[in-house]
């Protein structure tokens, strides 16, 4: 049987029409299918799977083949603990060049004073941010006040006392039900809540918006060392000038987690007081959501934190992933193009089109709409748990995720809402007309779900049903859309057996 690459080259005999990234990608698949068939087939099946669903999970996107190819090389074999030009290993000059270029690109793209590009994930970036703040604002001053040069010089008793004191400092962040992330300190099962005394602020239950006066009131009362702003399920924008003032008034460090909206900052959608960069002391982000890069994280900060961040090893990191850092550099360079700016604006336009159609059809959206890339549908009036809505939409080829809403009585597993996002569909090239179609499909599915309780295991095990006619119609409409906007159109799936 001819290889995937052979068939591709035969089908596109004109060399000027051949895509070099496609050639490289298919060549790697050929090798894996031959040498490690089970792994190769799983990769092929995942490609087919992603091509057969409308990806509407707000935290997911599609990276370029260039980004993917950068991760598949011998850079993965190099240990490089430390920071560029200050490594704990020898022979790191090539990794130094890549990491330095990645950091400089990040600084230019976001207007940051310093950039640390090693974190393996957004959670790692957030952990590094809080550890850097603790080190810079609590630990180092305390060590100096005690008359020592470094924390390693402290006697055991004083060291234990300092650890206990650090854990008493307060951190104020958005609660999970109000749209915050589990790494924002308000989830006790997460390590963040164990590093400081973490307090939540909530959205106003009437407006479902964050109330700056209320945040200021809580901050004034508790005087936190850290004020966190960011979200994983909030469909509006923050005013970072206001949050900076709140932080200054109580002497707090302002840390912004822009994992979800970094691409909207890079693309010039969030500007002025909606851009966190001029106001925040530390900004963290992932690189794989609206930035369309590899899975990973970044920390952007004021210069005063640069030295602490560059000591992430041994603070909380070991060896970085140089092959992923190379891919981050490529994604950041892609984000500097005019095409990316157009993309970022289209992401928000598409989300707002979805919102308009949903509201026109009587669905209730948290906050009444969206100003960013996501929206959350409150399913309470439909009597459909988020878990069941997620399952039923998945069954017709639409990937969303269940999501809690403020004061959610259904809990974290069932939930009363679903979250949807437009980054991935916009990457495929879809626009307002397609969003109208997608929204109408979703409305029809949601309004035709029948919820049935499992008598043996109770209502918590209830299941959803959708008539075959409705389901088949939805699947066909989804297939029609995907047929017009294929993922990686340069890769011919007909050759992937």
From Swiss-Prot:
Its EC number(s): 2.1.2.1
Domain of life of the source: Bacteria
Enzyme class, first EC level, given as a word: transferase
A cellular component annotation (GO) from this entry: cytosol
Residues that span the membrane, as ranges: none
Catalytic activity annotation: (6R)-5,10-methylene-5,6,7,8-tetrahydrofolate + glycine + H2O = (6S)-5,6,7,8-tetrahydrofolate + L-serine
UniProt-listed InterPro entries: PyrdxlP-dep_Trfase, PyrdxlP-dep_Trfase_major, PyrdxlP-dep_Trfase_small, Ser_HO-MeTrfase, Ser_HO-MeTrfase-like, Ser_HO-MeTrfase_PLP_BS, SHMT-like_dom
Site positions for Plays an important role in substrate specificity: 288
Gene Ontology MF, one: glycine hydroxymethyltransferase activity
One example of a Gene Ontology biological process annotation: glycine biosynthetic process from serine
Cofactor(s) named in the record: pyridoxal 5'-phosphate
Binding-site residues for (6S)-5,6,7,8-tetrahydrofolate, renumbered to this chain: 176, 180-182
Subcellular location(s) per record: Cytoplasm
Pathway: One-carbon metabolism; tetrahydrofolate interconversion; Amino-acid biosynthesis; glycine biosynthesis; glycine from L-serine: step 1/1
Residues recorded with modification N6-(pyridoxal phosphate)lysine: 289
Keyword terms: Amino-acid biosynthesis, Cytoplasm, One-carbon metabolism, Pyridoxal phosphate, Transferase
Oligomer and partners: Homodimer.
Family membership noted in the UniProt record: Belongs to the SHMT family.
Function: Catalyzes the reversible interconversion of serine and glycine with tetrahydrofolate (THF) serving as the one-carbon carrier. This reaction serves as the major source of one-carbon groups required for the biosynthesis of purines, thymidylate, methionine, and other important biomolecules. Also exhibits THF-independent aldolase activity toward beta-hydroxyamino acids, producing glycine and aldehydes, via a retro-aldol mechanism.
Protein known as: Serine hydroxymethyltransferase
Organism from which the protein derives: Chlamydia trachomatis serovar L2 (strain ATCC VR-902B / DSM 19102 / 434/Bu)
